Each structure stands twice: as structure tokens, then as C-alpha cells.
């Protein structure tokens, strides 16, 4: 047998080790973090609790600054983990106190989403996105015009809360400036179910942001099977984008209604309340558009639907209505209803004993009002040039540093 001789030069060539995958700890809720510490790091589970507090209470992302962790544990974390938060491309305050952040998603600089903070008397609400874009094609929504790109990760969802809470100086259980979170930003939350539910778990965890379940609201256009699943996995407040009380009109506004018509949607909402004893009502959102869905007959149809819902749940005020004046955006064919029509619509509902509120328009001077959220997706938005200039400017500053 011939002997195979390996040239010595080949023996000297270093073999590059496979890159170690690092776990972004923002992707994990308490249970996931406990498993990571026990199974991957071989550490006690309580260490996960310490790290959660550092990340979500003190907004620390550098393991070396987590001073109650031993040197050996910090070395393990550097090797196996990281804390990656969204990059703030720019932030805009509104004249009414509303604040909007444009956050870059991913490392390629092609995707971004918007997050909005809305202060009010005694409360501060953060509107959080769940997807880059949206694929449901609701005809009156700005986000729908850009199409759907992808789901956000858990880290990208909870990262929005992290960015806002850090900016606000929020201290859970002490100096709470962020009191409510609404999953009403870009995207349909129930189409990104697992990541959204995991992120909401961190929002409600005392080691996270410590929000009561009733102060976290998920808004859906009406994916009936996922509403049923949500009832078994979470007890957050539920809001439904209704916008019409008859199927013909709703199908023209919310195409999803063709698959899940109003009767099926209302039945699933009733099941949600029956299976969730901590929740006693569902909020039905109704965007008022001039000459489209703001006539007295539309109000009477909505009043009848709410009474039927109360009867199905066997509870008064099980259905609450939130009237939203339409917020115009470039290219839309819809107009906002006049103040007279809005008040007349509300009066019909109130006279029918339907608990009804009119949402005050906030942040429309910075395109942060409801329905105006529209982050960059590839090359399809009017702010793409500004987005790219900002990123290029940041890169130049980093290179010069």
C-alpha cells in the first residue's frame, strides 16, 4: 500500500472554528431565559432573573456592567449570548406630547418600523408594531399600502418597549411613565402569534415591565381561529378593528371579512370573554370616514350588533365602541367625518345604551396618528430617501469615531 504523505505546509494551515451562534436574550421570556441559563450555561435559574432585571429595569445591555454576576458567568454570557436592541434611526416629538421612533430592523438597513408613545392624564400608552408592513390590505390604512415584508421577532417587538421605556426614564414599580401597551402599530399581531404572545409575557412579567394584563391590549382585524387560540394562552385585553356592522360594507374596508364574516367574528369574541374570566369586555374600533360608514343607519346597525353581543355574553357593556376619526394619508380616497357627524353617530350609540368613546386624534403632525404608521419597506415608501440619508450619516460618524 502506498503511503500518503501530507505536506507539512498543509498541517500548518489553521482550521477556522464554526462561528458560535449567540442567543439574543431579548428573544426570551422568563421561562425561555431560565432554560437558557440552566441548559446552555449550566447556571442556576435565578441568574436569569437577575439578568432580566438588568435588561428591562435598568436598560443595561453590556454583561460587564451587570455587577452582581460573577466574572466566570459574564464570560459565558459573552461567549453564548448578546442583547441586541433596535437601532433608533430618528425620533420625532409632536406638539401634543406624542413621540414617535423610527427603528431599524435587522442588519441590512432595508426595514424599519414605527413605535409611538402617547401621554395622557395619569397614563402613558405605547403603540407597538408586530410586523414590517401588513398583508391584510385594509383599504383605509396607510400601512396596508406598502404590503407585507416579514414578521418581527420577539426581540424586535419587546425592543420597542425597551427603547421607549429607556427614553422615558421608566422604572417599573417605582417611576412608571409607561402604563399601557397596545399592539395596534404596524401589522396584524395574530399573524405573528408566537412572537407577540412571548413579547406580551415579558411586558406583563414583574421581572420585565410589570404591566397588568388589562393594560396590555391586542388589536386584531379578526382572525377567528387565532382569537380562539389567544383565549387559551393569554388574558390580555382584546380589541377588534370592526369599522362596519354589515358584511357588505366591512368586506370593502377589511377584506379579511370575506373569510371570517361578522357573525363568526362576534362569536369568537364572545368565546374569548367566556374563556377569560379576568376580561369583561371587548373594544370594537370603528374608524369614521365621510360618507362611507358614518351615516345614522350605520350607527343603528352597530348599536344592534353591540346589543346582540351583550346578550351572547350575558353581560351588559360586554361590547364597547371606540370611534376613531379617520386620519388622512397621501393617496387615500377617504376623508375624515365632520365633527357634527361624529357626535351624531356617538349620540345614537349612547341613546341605545352602548358605551362609546371618541378617540382624540394625537400625533397627526408627525404621521403618528392611528392608521398613519408606515415604516420603510425596501424602496416603497416616501421616507426611504430620508431613512437612507440618516443611516449613511450614522455610518460616517461611526467611521470617523
Swiss-Prot record:
Keywords: 4Fe-4S, Cytoplasm, Disulfide bond, Iron, Iron-sulfur, Metal-binding, Methyltransferase, rRNA processing, S-adenosyl-L-methionine, Transferase, tRNA processing. It comes from the Bacteria. GO terms for molecular function: 4 iron, 4 sulfur cluster binding; metal ion binding; rRNA (adenine(2503)-C2-)-methyltransferase activity; rRNA binding; tRNA (adenine(37)-C2)-methyltransferase activity; tRNA binding. GO terms for biological process: rRNA base methylation; tRNA methylation. [4Fe-4S] cluster binds at residues 134, 138, 141. One of its GO terms (cellular component) is cytoplasm. Residues 120-365 form the Radical SAM core domain. Coiled coil: none annotated. The active site is at 114 (proton acceptor), 370 (s-methylcysteine intermediate). Signal peptide: none annotated. Its cofactor is [4Fe-4S] cluster. Disulfide bonds join 127-370. It catalyses: adenosine(2503) in 23S rRNA + 2 reduced [2Fe-2S]-[ferredoxin] + 2 S-adenosyl-L-methionine = 2-methyladenosine(2503) in 23S rRNA + 5'-deoxyadenosine + L-methionine + 2 oxidized [2Fe-2S]-[ferredoxin] + S-adenosyl-L-homocysteine; adenosine(37) in tRNA + 2 reduced [2Fe-2S]-[ferredoxin] + 2 S-adenosyl-L-methionine = 2-methyladenosine(37) in tRNA + 5'-deoxyadenosine + L-methionine + 2 oxidized [2Fe-2S]-[ferredoxin] + S-adenosyl-L-homocysteine. Binds 1 [4Fe-4S] cluster. The cluster is coordinated with 3 cysteines and an exchangeable S-adenosyl-L-methionine. Gene3D superfamilies: 1.10.150.530, Aldolase class I (3.20.20.70). It is found in: Cytoplasm. Reaction proceeds by a ping-pong mechanism involving intermediate methylation of a conserved cysteine residue. HAMAP family: RNA_methyltr_RlmN (MF_01849). Belongs to the radical SAM superfamily. RlmN family. This is Dual-specificity RNA methyltransferase RlmN. It comes from Xanthomonas campestris pv. campestris (strain ATCC 33913 / DSM 3586 / NCPPB 528 / LMG 568 / P 25). The gene is rlmN.
Amino acid at each position: 500500500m502506498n503511503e500518503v504523505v501530507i505536506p507539512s505546509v498543509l498541517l500548518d494551515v489553521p482550521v477556522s472554528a464554526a462561528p458560535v451562534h449567540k442567543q439574543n436574550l431579548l428573544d426570551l421570556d422568563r421561562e425561555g431565559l431560565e432554560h437558557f441559563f440552566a441548559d446552555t450555561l449550566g447556571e442556576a435559574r435565578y441568574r436569569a432573573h437577575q439578568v432580566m432585571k438588568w435588561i428591562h429595569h435598568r436598560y443595561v445591555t453590556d454583561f460587564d456592567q451587570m455587577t452582581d454576576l460573577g466574572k466566570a458567568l459574564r464570560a459565558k454570557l459573552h461567549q453564548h449570548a448578546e442583547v441586541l436592541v433596535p437601532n433608533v434611526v430618528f425620533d420625532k416629538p409632536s406638539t401634543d406630547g406624542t413621540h414617535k421612533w423610527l427603528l431599524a430592523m435587522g442588519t441590512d438597513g432595508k426595514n424599519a418600523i414605527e413605535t409611538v408613545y402617547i401621554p395622557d392624564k395619569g397614563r402613558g400608552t405605547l403603540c407597538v408594531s408586530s410586523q414590517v408592513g401588513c398583508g391584510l390590505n385594509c383599504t383605509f390604512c396607510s400601512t396596508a399600502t406598502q404590503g407585507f415584508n416579514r414578521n418581527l421577532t420577539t426581540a424586535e417587538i419587546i425592543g420597542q418597549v425597551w427603547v421607549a421605556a429607556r427614553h422615558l426614564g421608566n422604572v417599573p414599580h417605582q417611576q412608571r411613565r409607561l402604563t399601557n401597551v397596545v399592539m395596534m402599530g404596524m401589522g396584524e399581531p395574530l399573524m405573528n402569534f408566537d412572537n407577540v404572545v412571548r413579547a406580551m409575557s415579558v411586558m406583563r412579567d414583574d421581572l420585565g415591565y410589570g404591566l397588568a394584563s388589562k393594560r396590555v391590549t391586542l388589536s386584531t382585524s379578526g382572525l377567528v381561529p387565532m382569537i380562539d387560540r389567544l383565549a387559551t394562552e393569554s388574558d390580555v385585553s382584546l380589541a377588534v378593528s370592526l369599522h362596519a356592522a354589515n358584511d357588505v360594507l366591512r368586506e370593502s374596508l377589511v377584506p379579511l371579512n370575506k373569510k371570517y364574516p361578522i357573525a363568526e367574528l362576534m362569536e369568537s369574541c364572545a368565546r374569548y370573554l367566556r374563556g377569560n374570566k379576568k376580561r369583561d369586555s371587548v373594544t370594537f374600533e370603528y374608524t369614521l370616514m365621510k360618507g362611507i360608514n358614518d351615516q345614522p343607519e350605520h350607527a343603528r346597525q352597530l348599536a344592534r350588533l353591540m346589543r346582540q353581543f351583550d346578550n351572547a355574553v350575558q353581560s351588559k357593556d360586554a361590547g364597547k365602541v371606540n370611534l376613531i376619526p379617520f386620519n388622512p394619508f397621501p393617496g387615500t380616497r377617504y376623508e375624515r367625518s365632520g365633527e357634527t357627524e361624529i357626535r351624531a353617530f356617538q349620540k345614537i350609540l349612547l341613546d341605545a345604551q352602548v358605551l362609546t368613546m371618541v378617540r382624540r386624534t394625537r400625533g397627526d403632525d408627525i404621521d403618528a396618528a392611528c392608521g398613519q404608521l408606515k415604516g420603510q419597506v425596501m424602496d416603497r415608501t416616501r421616507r426611504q430617501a430620508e431613512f437612507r440619508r440618516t443611516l449613511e450619516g450614522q455610518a460616517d460618524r461611526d467611521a470617523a469615531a
